[in-house]
């Protein structure tokens, strides 16, 4: 993995983002190793909260490591993190003083950024989701295969945005989550 990351950093790739699912008692002792990658390299390391989309229910084992704790642990090591302006639809992004790169936290489970979310996903089986935690799916695959007009497909997508819940908690409470894995959801 590090060899590939080094090759990417030596290439002409403009934006390199390294996603790390942070887990208590698994890799929480490596946070600073990941943050350290941003000291001399213009990359973004994004720490992602463990999400409840796994058939083995790992997230119920006490390994959940919330965004607030991730940030607090990083601050304890490097001092203040300077927030960077930008899209706050999926992550909080920061810069450490004198570091070339950036550090971000994606509160995927605590869902503190849902109010600004403008994202949708298309699942591996062609369903459109307006929230990771929603069961409200629109079958784009079948619409395309059945020669539904572009205008009607556009209307379906717009309708999906109009049906977004206020946040992921409301979406989950409304109808539960039936997908067992992020590989099914598209992430």
Language model region names:
Residues 1-57, 71-78, 125:
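Conserved C-terminal portion of the radical SAM core fold
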Residues 36-40, 50-187:
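Auxiliary Fe-S-binding modules of radical SAM enzymes
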């Amino acid at each position: 993995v590090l060899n590939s990351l080094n090759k990417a950093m030596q290439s002409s790739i403009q934006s390199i983002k390294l996603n790390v699912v942070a887990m208590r008692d698994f890799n929480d002792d490596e946070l600073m190793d990941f943050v350290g990658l941003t000291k001399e390299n213009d990359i973004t390391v994004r720490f992602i909260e463990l999400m409840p989309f796994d058939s083995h229910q790992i997230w119920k084992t006490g390994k959940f490591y919330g965004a607030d704790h991730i940030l607090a642990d990083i601050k304890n090591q490097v001092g203040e993190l300077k927030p960077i302006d930008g899209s706050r639809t999926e992550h909080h992004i920061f810069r450490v003083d004198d570091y070339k790169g950036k550090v971000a936290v994606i509160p995927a489970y605590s869902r503190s950024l849902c109010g600004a979310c403008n994202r949708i996903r298309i699942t591996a089986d062609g369903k459109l989701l307006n929230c990771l935690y929603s069961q409200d799916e629109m079958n784009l695959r079948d619409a395309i295969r059945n020669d539904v007009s572009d205008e009607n497909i556009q209307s379906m997508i717009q309708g999906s945005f109009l049906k977004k819940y206020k946040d992921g908690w409301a979406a989950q409470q409304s109808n539960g989550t039936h997908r067992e894995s992020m590989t099914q959801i598209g992430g």
